[in-house]
């Protein structure tokens, strides 16, 4: 994305390195720099919101998060709202199971199981 848009790129680790300079963020991040973080998968938003905090600690202005896929969990919506960070994804769980059903990868029983998981993944059995 940065190469195609001719914008700078940083890489945010889940925690600072325990060797070398001990950086959590690689790349040039200037104070006040508008920043959008990109993540592959958003479930609760926890990991990418830690990256947001790391960038904010370096005085970046995080204007949003973009993900490739979201499970659309209520926890993610609440966590992003609490952090006051907007987020969007290219696709999501609802669209995935819709396409899977239309393509005959899943049947009606599978659909019910997938929808039940989506309603309460922590307690699903």
Regions picked out by a protein language model, each given a short descriptive name:
Residues 1-35, 44-50:
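Short, glycine/charge-rich flexible loops or terminal/linker lids adjacent to PRPP-binding catalytic cores
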Residues 28-70:
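A contiguous pocket-lining binding segment that forms or flanks enzyme active sites
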Residues 2-14, 35-38, 87-92, 114-119:
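Short, Lys/Arg-enriched charge-dense amphipathic segments
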Residues 18, 24, 28, 41, ...:
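Residue-level preference for alpha-helix termini and adjacent loops
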Residues 53-125:
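PRPP-dependent phosphoribosyltransferase catalytic core
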């Amino acid at each position: 994305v940065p190469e195609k848009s001719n914008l700078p790129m940083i890489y945010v680790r889940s925690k600072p390195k325990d060797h070398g300079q001990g950086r959590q963020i690689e790349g040039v991040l200037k104070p006040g720099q508008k920043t959008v973080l990109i993540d592959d998968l958003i479930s609760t938003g926890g990991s990418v919101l830690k990256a947001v905090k790391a960038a904010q600690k370096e005085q970046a202005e995080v204007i949003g998060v973009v993900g490739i896929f979201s499970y659309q969990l209520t926890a993610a919506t609440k966590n992003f709202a609490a952090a006051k960070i907007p987020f969007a994804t290219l696709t999501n769980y609802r669209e995935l199971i819709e396409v899977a059903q239309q393509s005959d990868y899943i049947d009606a029983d599978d659909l019910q199981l997938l929808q039940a998981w989506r309603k309460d993944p922590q307690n699903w059995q």
